[in-house]
Amino acid sequence: YVVAHFHYQLSMGATFGLFAGFYYWFPKIVGKTYNETLAKIHFWVLFIGVNLTFFPQHFLGMSGMPRRIPDYPDAFAPYNYISSIGSMISFIAVFVFAFTVYDALANGEEADSNPWTEPGFFESTPVYWLESNYATSLEWAVDSPTPFHAFHVVPKPVSYTHLTLPTIC
């Protein structure tokens, strides 16, 4: 049970968060877009793979399978077999991810400065509408990838209205 719970936290909590951050920031860092269909395939293949790997381990732990021993009783073989298949599927997801990154670098279109079309908030100069696309934070107001010394002056916020908390009646 401990093995399943621990790896659920690592593989599905932390790792999926890292992939989400990668896919969100990739166009900004590299300056190219990726194929969203390939990214969704990567997500679903990895999701199915890690669930097939770690969900059966809950049953193994509750059935008393010991950890850290070189050989397990044959009674645990079916669930271990399912976990092994899930690991192979997760391994395939690694190749889908690698191909997604390769495809983006080789064939990706140029990314806009604000590829996710975040709404406006900052202005950097009096002609900010020529330089940026009204981003909610500074990183979306400059080109992708971000050039060195991106701002000539400190940008100032246009409005703080979206930052106010709702009033409770």
Language-model regions, residue ranges each:
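Hydrophobic cores of alpha-helical transmembrane segments in multi-pass integral membrane proteins
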Residues: 2-31, 35-69, 73-119, 124-160
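Conserved small/polar residues in nucleotide/adenosyl-binding loops
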Residues: 161-167
